[in-house]
């Protein structure tokens, strides 16, 4: 009788354990997954608008099962710090310029060489075609998942003391650049002194004279308030540097294949919202800084600037990367 009682007791415990395990598995499947996305720009900036659209679509496509919290204005660190955190799984996503990202994947230099793209249409045909997809896929080797590209317009120089009309006007000027060998080489090729520093330090450095200028697009010149302390904006459009939305491979490996697929779809589907937002923001930013009294000029001869930067193609690119540049140029 005692043996029968013990057997029955063990059976009850075993059955209870099975039910508890089943309930635990159900809870895990039903549990909301919360992921984090970092961006160094303010809330109303076009890239953050793209980030938020991506987050909205992830939640929609997953029927609310996956949420993406967007942390803007460098709450989780500057671009380089966020890239490193994504690489090691500390942050799940970040939107960054491919300029600092090229330190982790040098092949990305092929997408951001000076005067490479004829116009925005050429840029998007490249990025949304086979070439762009190849470079997104290439991010896996660095422990990232490349999701999509966002717009960042064309970059030009802005300075505190004088406008830039010719290459010689840049000689000896200390110009802030992103932490990128290519951008340092680009500024050096024009006779200026490249000064890498984090984006958040640029305003005070312009104000105090630590640097004489920087280079960026209309929205950044406006949203950062750099136009308040660097009144001369000289349009040379020396490069178009795409933004990339990347995911941590470590984070994505924890998800099902179906969830990764819907995240990739959400990223692609968020792109047009970001592009449209960029166009609108850029137009308003240019109007705003002109109204604020900034001195806007075009350089005298773009060919002079292009010729000065041309040696970068040989010094910065491998034969493989140069082959990609030729493919980019061939896109019609």
Labelled PLM ranges:
Residues 1-34:
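Short, low-complexity disordered leader/linker segments with a strong preference
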Residues 23-122, 131, 139-332:
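N-terminal secretory/targeting leader peptides
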Residues 136:
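Conserved glycine-rich "GG(E/T)P / GGGxP" loop and the immediately following alpha-helix
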